[in-house]
Amino acid sequence: LKGMFSVLVDDPVSYVNAPVLARSRGVETALVTEGDSPDHRSMVRVRMACADGSSQVVAGTVFGARDSEKLVEIDGLDLDLPISEHMLVFAYEDKPGVVGVVGQVLGAAGINIANMQVCRGGGGALLALTVDSAVDSGTVDAIRLQINAVRGAAIDLE
């Protein structure tokens, strides 16, 4: 919570006041502990209620001696992607050619891809990328249209 609200509010955020900030903004939190996780020693899973009534789930973990942060799940699909300042996520019907289209559109916009992962499940696919610079909404929209994405978004954690 501290990390999430540190980038969202102007006031100082601490481990003590982060739960209070969350409640005051309508964010429900719960601490759930499980004995043994086969994959991660610790993991944070966030379920978000969207304005359109849908929900999304994102999970992340910290690993290694350097405490590297990575995404490990989006909407039930497993992935292993470093968290970066600039990221893109697209959900689409699994079909050939999507990776090429995304690479072409980003290349034409001068955006360098740092990491990319495709995950599949139930006929759908998720493409998650880290990129070297912010991606404008026009480029995100162009990708979304060309790959016929169900959802697509740029995430900037500056």
Which residues does each PLM region occupy?
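A conserved regulatory-domain signal marking ACT and ACT-like small-molecule sensing domains
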Residues: 1-158
